[in-house]
Structures are given as C-alpha cells and as structure tokens.
C-alpha cells in the first residue's frame, strides 16, 4: 500500500503512477493507493490500521508526523508487514527504511537561493509550509536557516513561517494573512506543491504580481501559468513518478 499525506494532491497522484509502473514490472502485486482526507497523523493512523486489518504485505508511508506514526509502524511490523517511509520520513523505530526524495541540504539551500534570485537581495520574505509536524518540510526549513545565515542574505529578512497543512484553501488564507501582516513582503517560499500554487494564486488575486514573488517546490504542470504571468520566477521539484516507483520497489524487496 502506498499511503500519502492526503488525497487529491497532484504530487502524490504522480507518485502513484510510478508505483503502478513498478507493480507492472514486478508482476503479481497490487498497489493500493490511499491516504486520509485530512492531512493529519491521526487520520493517517486510521488509514494504516485499516491496512493492517486487510493484512497487506507492505506499507510505504509519506508521513504527516515523524514521531506520531512510530507506534502504528511498529504495530504493522509486529504483524509481519514491511513498513518503509518515503518522501517524508517516520522515526527509525517505526519503519525498516526511509527513502528521501533528494539531498536535504540541497533542497534547503536552493529554496533560499531561488528566493534571492526572485525578489532581489533585500526585503522581507516568509515561509508557507505544509503541516508543522511534516518531517521533510521541517528538515528543509532547518537547511534553509543554515543557508540564510550566509552574508549574501544579510539584507533579506525572514519575517515568519506559517503552515497551510497541505490544504489549498488554508494555504491560500495563510498567504493572504502574510500580505496583511507584512505590507512590505516581497517573497514567499513554499516547499510544498499545494502551498506554492495557493500562494501564487493569492499573489495574482491581490494584484501583487511584480511586488511579491513566490518560489519553492511545485509541479511544472501546476505552475506553468504562474511562471508565465510573473507571480513565480523559478521553483524546483524532483520527479514524483520516480519516487513512487522506487517506493514500491523498495517495499517489494
């Protein structure tokens, strides 16, 4: 089973495509693509309990909370189920392996560099993340702090970090809140494919294109229009299809 942070997110749907591709190559296995409607650890635990009851052979989880999912991971392993985490890790005691999407330090430093390239080397910016417990986003933000401490960013001011919980509407409202709280804001870094689109849409709707620039991690298919209209100059991502493919192969091994 491929368990994602939340259903209806394009990044994870692309990962599921890769998972299906791996399943076809392996042969004789079925991939159950599932996840909660709410992007919380509690909702994921319910999903995993259901999978344990179904006696699946393996569970590959992108975690909403590194620590809160350890007990349910242990429970699954005690039942003979292989548990790995991918994209966003579970604590070591709750899985046998973790698959990171890319180099954590590279992701963190790149986001700060993209922000500087987008807004210039002075002014205010903020972070719009996923959930406050998300393993991957929190690790990337720690790496952003290391990069941001370098002297070339001395005229830039990191004013806030807010959380949209990987929900479009909440992320959009958080972006609006940043505009209101920081009228001189020049940039938003959103290291989540949901948040970056929501932030770019908020910039456009508020007539702030050319004043506030959005960067972070997003899908090209979802960000194309926002780059064309100027709300985002640059952003990055790895291939989620390959990530899902690798997660299923590792689960099978």
List the predicted regions and their residue ranges.
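A residue-level marker of the well-folded mature domains of exported/periplasmic proteins
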Residues: 1-253
């Amino acid at each position: 089973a491929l368990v994602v942070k939340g259903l209806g997110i394009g990044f994870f749907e692309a990962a599921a495509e890769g998972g299906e591709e791996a399943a076809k190559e392996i042969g004789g296995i079925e991939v159950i693509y599932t996840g909660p409607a709410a992007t919380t650890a509690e909702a994921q635990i319910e999903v995993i309990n259901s999978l344990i009851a179904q006696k699946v052979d393996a569970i590959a989880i992108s975690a909403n909370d590194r620590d809160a999912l350890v007990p349910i991971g242990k429970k699954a392993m005690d039942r003979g189920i292989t548990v790995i985490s991918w994209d966003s890790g579970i604590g070591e005691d709750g899985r046998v392996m973790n698959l990171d999407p890319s180099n954590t330090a590279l992701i963190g430093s790149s986001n700060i560099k993209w922000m500087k390239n987008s807004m210039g080397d002075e002014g205010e910016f903020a972070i719009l993340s996923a959930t406050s417990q998300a393993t991957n986003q929190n690790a990337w933000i720690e790496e952003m702090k290391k990069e941001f401490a370098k002297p070339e960013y001395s005229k830039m001011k990191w004013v806030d970090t807010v959380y949209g919980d990987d929900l479009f509407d909440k992320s959009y409202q958080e972006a609006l809140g940043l505009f209101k709280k920081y009228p001189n804001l020049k940039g938003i870094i959103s290291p989540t494919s949901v948040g970056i689109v929501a932030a770019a849409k908020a910039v456009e709707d508020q007539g702030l294109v050319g004043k506030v620039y959005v960067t972070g991690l997003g899908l090209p298919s979802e960000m194309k229009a926002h780059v064309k209209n100027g709300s985002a100059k640059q952003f990055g991502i790895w291939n989620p299809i390959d990530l899902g493919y690798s997660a299923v192969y590792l689960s099978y091994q």
